[in-house]
Amino acid sequence: MWHSAFRTAVIPSVDSDTRLYRAGVRLDHVVIAVSDFERSNAFYRVVFGAEVVAIDGRVAYRVGEQQLNVHGPGTRPAMLARIPVAPGNSDLCFEWPGAIEEAVEHLRARGIRVEAGPMTRGGAKGPGTSVYFRDPDGTLLELISYAS
């Protein structure tokens, strides 16, 4: 199958201009959808320490240097994906700065059920150890630790 290569190798870019890579192109934000702003604001603050910010009449969660733009009841985004995101249909992974056992304890102390893991998974920095859980709308969330 064509996609088996993605499991074993990095596919080089066909673009010979590598300035973008040297400049450190990074993901700026992603969009999630929620069904209840209050409930989701509380969840992302408690679990991730998110700062809830208003941007042009919309809500975003800032988690470290990452930003989640939030679509929800009453919002009318100017730009939408061809198939807009809906509550519960996203899958996001955040890097945990310590041992994965600390992440599990962090979640359990906040009454959040770990759905799967710890298990070895591949992430942006290579192999790591992950746990999976869900936000109140069912969005799949993953914490990955690269700590040895």
Give the positions of each predicted feature.
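Acidic, Ala/Val/Gly-enriched low-complexity intrinsically disordered segments
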Residues: A5, A9-V10, V14-D17
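Conserved beta-strand-loop-alpha-helix junction that forms the acyl-donor binding cleft
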Residues: V34-D36
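Short phosphate-engaging motifs
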Residues: R39-S40, A99
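Conserved active-site tyrosine of GNAT-family acetyltransferases
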Residues: S40-R45, L107, G138
